[in-house]
């Protein structure tokens, strides 16, 4: 079907980008080592406009690469056995759902710290938007200043699919939407825009909301930001892993993701969605807000316990005898 073709094209675009970055211009130059490196590269969320992905999604994307290499072998473009060197992750039923999430209590502590000590900084804005909206990292990265209506009685931000200027939404035009934000979030964004935001344009002449001195903040900026602020020692808290921050290698930027306490942007999204459901926000409202189907939310994002789900249904059953 047309949707299947589009999905396969999207998956192979990431593989094509990896090959370009690695200087691989001919399929004959591909090796098993390259294919394993691609698996790691994609798992960690590399690729323009891409987010970190869960094992079940990674398996699907690697399976598409396998299918492509099988076709390439049929036309003698690559060795017959090359596709077998694409390493597919083993997925169990339990492994199809990530247990990595950010608890609301930790989110509150982090945001309170940023509110107190790094108010309206880029770090504060990234963490606040990821948690408050539950949106994907790529969607927040793609926001422009003009996508924000902050001085209205009902402030909001608009997510727009702009693939021609390097900020696509995962679900294309179907992912376009307005998200309501609280007055507090609107005030923080306005103070960031009026204050520490770097007043720069990106290479397409757009005014990004979240910037560095070089232009629009990169996905690696988002990831390193969240790895840093979710590490307890960053805000002076005791290390839960009995490490000395002065000597711990996890405090370095390149190895921060290895700390068991750190959380990637995708885990912030998971925690936010679970929190919204725990607060009684209907699943269809959450679905539209975070641009994911109710089935996807139920299976991959809603980390509530069975007890918490029961409590969420209780208010709807009060009229029953």
Language-model segment annotations:
Residues 142-191, 197-203:
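Conserved tyrosine-mediated DNA breakage-rejoining catalytic core shared by Y-recombinases
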Residues 76, 129-143, 279-281, 290-292:
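A short, glycine-centered helix-capping/turn motif at helix boundaries
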Residues 1-97:
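N-terminal core-binding DNA-recognition domain of tyrosine recombinases/integrases
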Residues 290-315:
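Catalytic-site neighborhood detector that most strongly recognizes the C-terminal catalytic loop/helix
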Residues 315-321:
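C-terminal secondary-structure termini that scaffold catalytic or DNA-interacting sites
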Residues 186-225, 237-250:
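Major-groove DNA-contacting interfaces characterized by cationic-aromatic clusters
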Residues 104-137, 141, 174, 204:
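Basic, Lys/Arg- and aromatic-enriched nucleic-acid-binding interface segment
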Residues 22, 224-288, 295:
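Short, basic (Lys/Arg/His-rich) helix/loop patches that form interaction surfaces
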